[in-house]
């Protein structure tokens, strides 16, 4: 453990409440699914309907590489030049990304994807487990900064138009049905192994409908001789707050139970792999007066004795810190106490 920092803040900006699905949206629209869907979920209806004129010429399924810089609309034809090959470059230990786009004029009942073998001319191979992919899913949002006055503060929802945007990368969903006149991006990542032999590797992303091949997309990855250290060795000071309370509520498990820690482990491992350095700990009940959908409680039990002295139980604090260290987040602990208002 490198450092312990205690915060007693007098002012703190809230990032706003994070509202979980509860069978209805924040605005009261039914979602048509359980309050806390696991593994997969239904997306909300798109307020923007497909254009009959725009889609009239699309009578089959189209597949192309896109760009990672664009969030492709769900029901608008993607504005791209069809591309069957994309080339990426990276150091050993670096993660490189690409985005493929599927759009179809006919229904696909079982859209899925897989990776072929990636080899260089000398027969060296990038292992299968270096590659991950996921369908890019869509969530509802509204206009950002419409009045030019920033996004914070009270705002009437009726004054801001709603739209569906591509946002989460769903690595749990392995296959999906795709209605006609719909766009579906696929996000691809290669975490180049530290042990990879420098060279240019060629392979394929296979887009299928069930067992029927729709398209082979060529992917070329050039591996440099340079090496990026492991995430826990990075100097970059990444501090994304964790909320164990939100995880317990969403997965409907008792707080600080073994089921709770089991639910948190894959989430916190992803955070560790991103280079997270800080463990978020709270020492008092609602240290900033709630604000978030799942308020932060104390990880230390405060007990005032009959004689006026205080005793403190650090059991939960210790379990939380030890758990976070076990997934690889072990540089600092930021402890938040009371925020006076």
Model feature map: region roles:
Residues 22-82, 102-188:
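Surface-exposed binding patches on compact interaction domains or structured appendages
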Residues 98, 111-113, 186-188, 203, ...:
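Hydrophobic residues positioned within well-ordered beta-strands of beta-sheet architectures
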Residues 90-95, 179-183, 198-199:
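Solvent-exposed, conformationally flexible loop/turn segments
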Residues 83-106, 186, 265, 280:
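Contiguous beta-strand segments within globular domains
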Residues 160-161, 170, 191, 201-209, ...:
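Aromatic-lined carbohydrate-binding surfaces of glycoside hydrolases
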Residues 1-25:
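Bacterial Sec-dependent N-terminal signal peptides
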Residues 105-107, 191-198:
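Short, surface-exposed loop/turn segments at beta-strand-coil junctions that are enriched for proline
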Residues 85, 175, 216-220:
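Well-ordered beta-strand positions in beta-sheet-rich domains
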């Amino acid at each position: 453990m490198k450092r312990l920092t205690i915060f007693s803040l007098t002012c703190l900006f809230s990032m706003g409440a994070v509202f979980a699905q509860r069978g209805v949206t924040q605005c009261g629209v039914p979602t048509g699914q359980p309050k806390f869907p696991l593994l997969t979920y239904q997306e909300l209806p798109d307020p923007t309907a497909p254009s009959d004129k725009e889609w009239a010429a699309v009578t089959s399924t189209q597949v192309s590489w896109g760009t990672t810089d664009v969030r492709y609309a769900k029901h608008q034809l993607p504005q791209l030049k069809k591309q069957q090959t994309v080339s990426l470059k990276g150091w050993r230990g670096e993660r490189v990304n690409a985005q493929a786009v599927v759009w179809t004029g006919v229904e696909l009942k079982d859209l899925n994807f897989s990776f072929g073998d990636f080899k260089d001319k000398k027969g060296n191979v990038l292992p299968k487990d270096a590659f991950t992919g996921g369908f890019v899913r869509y969530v509802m949002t509204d206009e950002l900064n419409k009045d030019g006055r920033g996004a914070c503060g009270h705002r009437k929802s009726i004054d801001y138009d709603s739209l569906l945007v591509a946002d989460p990368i769903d690595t749990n969903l392995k296959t999906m049905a795709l209605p006609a006149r719909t766009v579906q991006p696929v996000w691809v990542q290669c975490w180049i192994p530290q042990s990879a032999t420098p060279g240019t590797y060629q392979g394929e992303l296979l887009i299928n409908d069930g067992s029927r091949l729709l398209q082979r997309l060529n992917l070329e990855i050039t591996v440099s001789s340079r090496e990026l250290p492991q995430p826990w060795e990075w100097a970059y000071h990444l501090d994304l707050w964790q909320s164990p309370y939100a995880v317990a509520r969403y997965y409907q498990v008792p707080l600080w139970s073994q089921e709770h820690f089991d639910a948190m482990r894959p989430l916190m491992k992803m955070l560790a792999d991103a280079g997270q350095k800080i463990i978020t700990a709270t020492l008092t009940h609602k240290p900033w007066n709630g604000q978030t959908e799942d308020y932060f409680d104390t990880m230390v039990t405060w007990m005032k004795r009959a004689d006026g002295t205080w005793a403190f139980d650090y059991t939960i604090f210790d379990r939380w810190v030890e758990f976070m260290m076990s997934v690889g987040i072990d540089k600092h602990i930021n402890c938040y106490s009371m925020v006076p208002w």
